[in-house]
Amino acid sequence: MAKKVQAYVKLQVAAGMANPSPPVGPALGQQGVNIMEFCKAFNAKTESIEKGLPTPVVITVYSDRSFTFVTKTPPAAVLLKKAAGIKSGSGKPNKDKVGKVTSAQVREIAETKAADMTGSDVDAMVRSIAGTARSMGLVVED
C-alpha cells in the first residue's frame, strides 16, 4: 500500500549548505521530519552543483514522517546574475542597464533549465530566459 502524503514543503536552499537553521529547520520541524537526515541527503545530492547556489527543493512528507525530495535547477535570475557578473538586477530595468549577457550564455542557461521549464522547444525557452534578462536590466547581445 502506498504511503499517505502529509505535506509538500517547498524551499530554496543553498546547494551543499543545508543545515538545521532557518529556513530548513522550522519548515521541516513542523512536519516532524528528521532535519539532520534531510540535510545530509540534500548536501550529498547537491555536491555536483556549485556550492552556495540557491537550489529549489520540493520535499514530500509522508504520514509516517518519512520523506522524499526533488531538487530543481537554480532560478534563471540567479544564473543570469552569475553569467553577467552582477550582484543584483536593475531597479529600473527599462532605463538603467546593469550588465550584458550573450545569446550563447542565454542559450546555455535555457538548456540547463530545460528539465524544469514548460517551453515546447529550446528556442521558446531561450526567449523566456531573454525576457527574464531584460526584466532584470540586462542587455542580451548576439
UniProtKB/Swiss-Prot annotation:
Write the record's keywords in alphabetical order, separated by commas: Methylation, Ribonucleoprotein, Ribosomal protein, RNA-binding, rRNA-binding
Q: Which domain of life is it from?
A: Bacteria
Record's keyword annotation contains Ribonucleoprotein? yes
PTMs per UniProt? One or more lysine residues are methylated.
Query: In this entry, which stretches build a coiled coil?
Result: none
Molecular-function GO terms, alphabetical = large ribosomal subunit rRNA binding; structural constituent of ribosome
Q: Which Pfam families match?
A: Ribosomal_L11, Ribosomal_L11_N
Which biological processes are named by the entry's GO terms? translation
Entry annotated with the keyword Ribonucleoprotein? yes
Q: What InterPro entries is this protein classified in? A: Ribosomal_uL11, Ribosomal_uL11_bac-typ, Ribosomal_uL11_C, Ribosomal_uL11_C_sf, Ribosomal_uL11_CS, Ribosomal_uL11_N, Ribosomal_uL11_N_sf
Q: Give the CC-aspect GO terms.
A: cytosolic large ribosomal subunit
Q: Which family does it belong to?
A: Belongs to the universal ribosomal protein uL11 family.
| Record's subunit section | Part of the ribosomal stalk of the 50S ribosomal subunit. Interacts with L10 and the large rRNA to form the base of the stalk. L10 forms an elongated spine to which L12 dimers bind in a sequential fashion forming a multimeric L10(L12)X complex.
Stated role: Forms part of the ribosomal stalk which helps the ribosome interact with GTP-bound translation factors.
The protein depicted here goes by the name Large ribosomal subunit protein uL11
Which organism is this protein's natural source?
Pectobacterium atrosepticum (strain SCRI 1043 / ATCC BAA-672)
* Upper classification of the organism: Bacteria, Pseudomonadati, Pseudomonadota, Gammaproteobacteria, Enterobacterales
